[in-house]
Regions:
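Active-site glycine-rich loops that stabilize anionic/oxyanionic intermediates
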Residues: 24-27, 89
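Active-site loop/oxyanion-hole signature of alpha/beta-hydrolase fold enzymes
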Residues: 5-7, 11, 33-37, 46-86, ...
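The conserved beta1-alpha1 loop
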Residues: 20-24, 206
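Catalytic histidine-centered segment of alpha/beta-hydrolase-like enzymes
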Residues: 236-245, 249
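Conserved alpha/beta-hydrolase catalytic His-Asp/Glu region
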Residues: 121, 136-192
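Flexible "cap/lid" loop of the alpha/beta hydrolase fold
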Residues: 96-100, 107-138
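Conserved serine/cysteine hydrolase catalytic core
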Residues: 170-224, 232
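Alpha/beta-hydrolase fold catalytic core
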Residues: 1-19, 40-43, 80-81, 186, ...
Length: 261
């Protein structure tokens, strides 16, 4: 089962739209909490921990079929028949997979800076850095940073990963399952061959300085999502929702409100 948290609007009514928010690799549901806060007046939100992340279950060989089943079970548990879905990076691929296999349950799809394609291995340094952190001997976050930085050189990436480090009693732990993520990585950067199309409204939000979605991906996107539109947030990279949150959140809210009017 997936761990999730519900954020209902302050003036909750049954006609308010629902939005499921799915984070990226090495993240947790907290990563997209700022979006839920920004939409709190108009949109009910469900924040999800992916398997092997946060408080969700550990799965040794995770793939998109596993994530899809978790999302299906979560909607059933919540009593929701339809919702909008928003995913960033790995979460975007999970949201796309869900939409393509559960069109009637996905009112619309919002994909943040990822495409429905297979990607090359690009996290080797991150894996090496995480495995280099000796949780049994570190005594502070500074110790962890020193060990992590032997392989991970970019300060923003270092700080993002260290958000997943916490102290439980006398031991340090990650909020994600490093070994299981590494084992599942080939399946997660891959993209399966899918014949279905998702014909409901679809919005791709792309970082203007990011290389995760390029013109070369347009054909793959349109073949699966014929009812697609795209917005580019200039001056942002892959972490577009964190770099320009006000712009990102307005795009998301405008998309949902237009469909709800």
């Amino acid at each position: 089962m997936l761990h999730y948290e519900v954020r209902k609007t302050a003036q909750y009514t049954a006609d308010k739209p629902w939005l499921v928010l799915i984070h990226g690799l090495f993240g947790s549901l907290d990563n997209l909490n700022s979006i839920a806060r920004a939409l709190a007046d108009e949109v009910n939100c469900v924040l999800v921990d992916l398997p092997n992340h946060g408080l969700s279950q550990t799965i040794e060989s995770l793939d998109y079929l596993d994530i899809n089943q978790g999302l299906v079970d979560m909607l059933a548990e919540l009593g929701l028949t339809r919702a909008h879905f928003l995913g960033h990076s790995l979460g975007g691929k999970a949201a796309m997979y869900f939409a393509l296999h559960n069109e009637s349950a996905c009112e619309s799809l919002i994909v943040a800076d990822i495409a429905p394609v297979s990607y090359p291995h690009r996290h080797q340094a991150v894996f090496a850095g995480l495995q280099n952190v000796d949780l049994a001997t570190i005594s502070s976050r500074r110790d962890a940073l020193q060990q992590l930085s032997e392989h991970v050189k970019e300060p923003p990436t270092q700080q993002f990963l260290l958000k997943g480090l916490y102290q439980h009693e006398d031991t340090w732990q990650w909020r994600f399952s490093v070994d299981e993520i590494i084992a599942s990585y080939p399946a997660l950067i891959d993209w399966p061959r899918i014949e279905e199309q998702f014909r409901n409204p679809t919005l791709f939000i792309i970082g203007g300085e990011s290389d995760y979605v390029t013109r070369d991906h347009q054909a793959a996107i349109r073949s699966l999502f014929p009812n697609v539109k795209a917005k580019v947030i200039h001056g942002t990279g892959h972490w577009l929702h964190a770099e320009k949150p006000a712009v990102f959140n307005k795009i998301v809210n405008d998309h949902i409100q237009k469909l709800s009017s």
